[in-house]
């Protein structure tokens, strides 16, 4: 019979010698009730009961009094209490962190001016490099909007439709973290502005710097260990990636933020003794992302589009009061093309 022990005042479950943290188990419930936002879980989350049911384990979480069932084989396959070898930020040059106060200074430029004047184009591209996003206004032809904007610096890569039901908003997140490489630029427009659906933006670099100031140990945990992301929702596709939530260059410069709990797979690349620290930082990062002081909210009116750095800026949506679905259209491009165009303009101006 499997050995079952609840330890550390309910924070740890031991199964056949393998230890699992309560918060890790709660984050990986197998009944479709994975928390939409990690920050909403109780800070004093623990285990009140664990009962063997055949080849499965029934666990009760406190203080939620929520029961979840885990297959023993699944726990064995995802065990992280095993010896693993491990070894061990500053903002990149030309980048400026921002928070809610930046809402009154959103960079924007009209498309005709971007096409006509290299100085305007340079300032607009430089704003994306500095702040991670910028608006385009005065888009006349909706069908050609993406082609015209992306053609300012790169070939169009990929077009997709994105719909959001009116009754639900979307927590800020980076797009497609399961892709490798992750799409680095995202261009977004609202096809029906009259239905609402304001955009929420968060500077992931600013959140990372804040976490580093508050909890250096937790910051190191998120930069030194991989998270896993997966999307198997489409038939014939199984997309997976394995990267840090906060990725640094070898010299310590902030490089990429990958944060999207919707596509997070079980964390198994963190030592048992580091898992609580990891989740403490993961949870705090989620709280910062959801904090109004780190967010700006802006509408996308008719004839407007938003280009954002998907390796830095987290994007969400506010819920709409309309009974109809808001409809957004987006496409991806690669940031190296933008930086190349920017460098060429810097050399010529």
Region annotations inferred by a language model:
Residues 10-12, 92-123, 129-133, 138-139, ...:
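Active-site environment of non-heme Fe oxygenases that use a 2-His-1-carboxylate facial triad
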Residues 1-126:
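Fe(II)/2-oxoglutarate
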């Amino acid at each position: 019979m499997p050995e079952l022990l609840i330890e550390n005042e309910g924070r740890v479950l031991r199964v056949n010698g393998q230890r699992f943290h309560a918060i890790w188990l709660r984050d990986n419930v197998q009944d479709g009730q994975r928390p939409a936002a990690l920050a909403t879980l109780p800070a004093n989350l623990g285990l009140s009961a664990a009962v063997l049911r055949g080849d499965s384990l029934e666990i009760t979480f406190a203080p939620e009094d929520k029961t979840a069932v885990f297959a023993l084989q699944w726990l064995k396959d995802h065990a992280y209490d095993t010896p693993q070898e491990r070894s061990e930020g500053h903002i990149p040059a030309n980048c400026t962190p921002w928070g809610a106060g930046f809402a009154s200074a959103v960079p924007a430029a009209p498309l005709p001016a971007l096409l006509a004047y290299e100085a305007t184009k340079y300032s607009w591209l430089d704003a994306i490099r500095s702040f991670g996003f910028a608006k385009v206004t005065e888009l006349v032809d909706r069908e050609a909007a993406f082609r015209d904007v992306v053609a300012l610096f790169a070939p169009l890569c990929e077009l997709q439709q994105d719909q959001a039901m009116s009754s639900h908003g979307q927590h800020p997140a980076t797009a497609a973290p399961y892709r490798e490489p992750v799409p680095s630029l995202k261009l977004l427009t609202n096809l029906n502005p009259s239905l609402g659906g304001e955009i929420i933006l968060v500077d992931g670099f600013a959140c990372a710097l804040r976490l580093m100031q508050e909890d250096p140990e937790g910051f190191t945990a998120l930069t030194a260990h991989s998270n896993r992301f997966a999307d198997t929702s489409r038939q014939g596709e199984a997309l997976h990636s394995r990267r840090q939530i906060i990725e640094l260059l070898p010299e310590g410069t902030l490089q990429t933020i990958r944060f999207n709990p919707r596509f997070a797979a079980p964390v198994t690349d963190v030592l048992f003794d580091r898992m609580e620290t990891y989740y403490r930082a993961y949870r705090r990062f989620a709280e910062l992302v959801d904090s109004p002081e780190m967010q700006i909210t802006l509408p996308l009116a008719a004839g407007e589009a938003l280009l954002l750095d998907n390796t830095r800026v987290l994007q969400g949506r506010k819920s709409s009061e309309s009974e109809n679905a808001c409809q957004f259209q987006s496409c991806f491009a690669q940031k190296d093309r933008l930086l190349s165009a920017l460098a060429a303009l810097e050399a010529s101006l």
